[in-house]
Amino acid sequence: EDLFLGFDDHAYEAAFEEVRKGAQRFQTFRDQLVPQISEELFLSIITEYEHYTRILSRLFGFSQLAFAADTQDQAAQAQVARVTQFYAEIDNQTMFFSLWWKALDNENAERLLKASGDFHYWLVAMRNFKAFTLSEAEEKIINIKDVTGVNALNMLYESITNRYLFKVEIDGELKELTRGEVTALVREPDPDLRERAYQALFKVYEGDAPILGKIYQAIVRD
């Protein structure tokens, strides 16, 4: 399915509204999530979940692609921040389902898994995080914190490093390359070219070592 024509595309704004309405509908299922839930109702609930999360993923993917194409584009930066915030808000509104599913007893979980069809792998993977899941209130706080914490730091890092240009000698000619282009060279079969590519990367990154180091430390400590 295509993404969007641009940030001014009517379909782009309409997608936000469709996700909002989908999340609102999904919240009406909360009281129906009981251990003895029928397979039919369970499938209808996760199908509804899939519908609006697919649209949300399109929004997220489109904003990220626009940002990756030009990390200095302020419109793209603003939309990445907007979609990231929106994603966290929707996730907080519908988090109750994943928490319920992780906490469900094994017998009923197995019963529902047998009827889950294409959702089977996703549901199994979700339960693998049971031991690392906090309370709903705590998980919501982490979601909100990440918007202005690690996610913002990652975007700052990308904005800084994607501006870099690297000088590498190729076939006797000194060429100026982008980060993506020079990164591709580190997988070339020619060992000398790989070495020059790595040296070019390290030389440029070293120039911003203090600020990049601070970003790394902040992400690790977050």
Put a short name on every predicted segment.
Residues E1-D222:
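A well-structured
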